[in-house]
C-alpha cells in the first residue's frame, strides 16, 4: 500500500497543479526531455548498484533467463496480443514499457516470511536487471514503430544510428572500468566519478552503459543514492500527473495492466520449474510497475501521443492486482524456513544498496 501511495499521491498533486496552472504541451519542451533522462539515469544506476552480486551468482542461470528470454517473452505476449486486439502497433512499444518488475516495489515485499531466501534473491536480481533490458528494448521498439507510422525519431544523446549509440555505450563501459581501476583505492574520488558518469550518461543517453557501471562502480553512497531513487520515483509520478489533464484511456489501461500481470504469471512459472511451488507462485505473481515504467512512458509521450493516457491506468491496475493476488496467496501459504542470509536490494532511506566497491 505504501508503494502504491508513492505513485498515486504525487501523480494526484501533479494533476492538481496542471489544472491550477493550465500547463499543457510540456512533453515538447527540451527541459522535459532532460528531466526525464535524469530521472531514468538515477533509477537505472540505483537498480544495478543495489544488486547483491554474491547471491545473484548462485542462481545466475535463472536470473539470466528471466532478464533476457523472460523480458522478451513478456514484451511479446503483452505487445503482440494488444496490438492485434486494438489494431495499433504502438502497443508493441507499450508492452515493453511495462514488461519490467519495479525494483523498489519488489524490495518492499522481500521481507515476506513466506518467500524463501533463494526466491527473494532471485526476485531482487530479476527486478534490478530487467530495467536496463526494457530500456534498450523500448528504444528499438519505438524506432521501429515510429518508422512504420512516419513519426519523427526521438533525438537523444549521441544521435546518429543505433549502432553509434551501442558503440557509445561500449566506450562508456570502458571509461567506467578504467576509472574504477585507477580510483578504487580512493573512496571520495570514486563517489565524484560516479556522479560524473551519471552526468555523462544523461548527456549522451548511454543508459545501458550506466546500468552496467552500477555493477562495479559502487562508492559508499548507498544512503544518498537510496534517497535519490525515492525522489526520482516521486518526481516521475508528479510529472506523470502533470500530463494527465487530457484524460486517460481506461479500457486500454485495464487491458495493458491485465496483460502485463498475465505475462508475468506465464513467464514466472515457465522459468522457475526447479523451485518449490510456493516460491514459484510468489515469483509468478511478482509483477509490479513503478519508476522505470513511469519514466519510459514520459519519454515515449514526447514521441507518441496518448502513451501516458494508457500507461498511467495500467500501472495502477498492475499494482492493485498484485496487492490482491499476493494477499490471497499469503493467506493460504505458510512461512518459509528462516535462514540468516543478507537480503539483496533493500530500498529505503537506511538501505544498503551496494555491498561491494569492486567486482569479484
Question: For each predicted feature, which ranges?
Answer:
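Transmembrane helical cores of multi-pass secondary ion antiporters/exchangers
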Residues: 1-359
Amino acid at each position: 500500500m505504501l508503494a502504491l501511495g508513492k505513485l498515486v499521491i504525487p501523480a494526484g498533486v501533479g494533476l492538481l497543479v496542471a489544472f491550477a496552472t493550465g500547463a499543457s504541451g510540456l512533453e515538447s519542451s527540451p527541459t522535459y526531455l532532460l528531466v526525464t533522462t535524469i530521472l531514468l539515469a538515477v533509477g537505472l544506476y540505483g537498480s544495478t548498484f543495489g544488486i547483491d552480486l554474491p547471491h545473484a551468482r548462485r542462481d545466475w542461470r535463472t536470473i539470466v533467463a528471466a532478464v533476457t528470454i523472460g523480458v522478451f517473452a513478456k514484451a511479446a505476449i503483452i505487445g503482440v496480443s494488444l496490438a492485434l486486439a486494438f489494431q495499433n502497433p504502438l502497443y508493441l512499444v507499450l508492452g515493453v514499457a511495462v514488461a519490467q518488475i519495479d525494483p523498489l516495489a519488489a524490495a518492499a515485499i522481500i521481507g515476506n516470511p513466506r518467500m524463501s531466501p533463494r526466491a527473494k534473491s532471485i526476485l531482487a536480481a530479476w527486478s534490478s536487471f530487467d530495467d536496463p533490458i526494457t530500456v534498450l528494448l523500448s528504444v528499438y521498439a519505438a524506432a521501429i514503430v515510429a518508422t512504420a507510422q512516419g513519426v519523427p525519431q526521438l533525438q537523444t544523446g549521441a544521435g546518429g544510428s543505433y549502432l553509434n549509440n551501442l558503440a557509445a555505450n561500449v566506450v562508456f563501459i570502458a571509461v567506467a572500468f578504467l576509472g574504477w581501476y585507477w580510483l578504487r583505492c580512493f573512496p571520495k574520488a570514486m563517489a565524484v566519478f560516479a556522479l560524473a558518469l551519471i552526468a555523462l550518461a544523461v548527456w549522451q543517453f548511454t543508459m545501458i552503459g550506466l546500468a552496467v557501471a552500477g555493477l562495479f562502480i559502487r562508492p559508499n553512497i548507498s544512503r544518498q543514492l537510496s534517497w535519490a531513487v525515492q525522489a526520482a520515483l516521486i518526481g516521475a509520478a508528479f510529472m506523470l500527473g502533470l500530463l494527465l489533464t487530457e484524460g486517460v484511456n481506461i479500457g486500454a489501461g485495464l487491458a495493458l495492466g491485465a496483460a502485463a500481470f498475465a505475462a508475468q504469471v506465464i513467464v514466472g512459472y515457465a522459468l522457475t520449474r526447479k523451485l518449490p511451488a510456493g516460491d514459484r507462485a510468489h515469483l509468478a505473481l511478482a509483477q509490479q510497475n513503478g519508476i522505470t515504467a513511469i519514466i519510459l512512458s514520459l519519454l515515449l509521450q514526447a514521441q507518441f501521443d496518448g502513451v501516458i493516457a494508457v500507461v498511467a491506468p495500467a500501472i495502477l491496475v498492475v499494482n492493485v492486482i498484485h496487492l490482491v493476488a499476493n494477499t490471497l496467496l499469503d493467506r493460504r501459504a505458510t512461512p518459509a524456513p528462516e535462514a540468516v542470509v543478507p537480503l539483496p536490494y533493500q530500498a529505503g532511506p537506511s538501505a544498503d544498496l551496494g555491498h561491494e566497491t569492486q567486482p569479484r
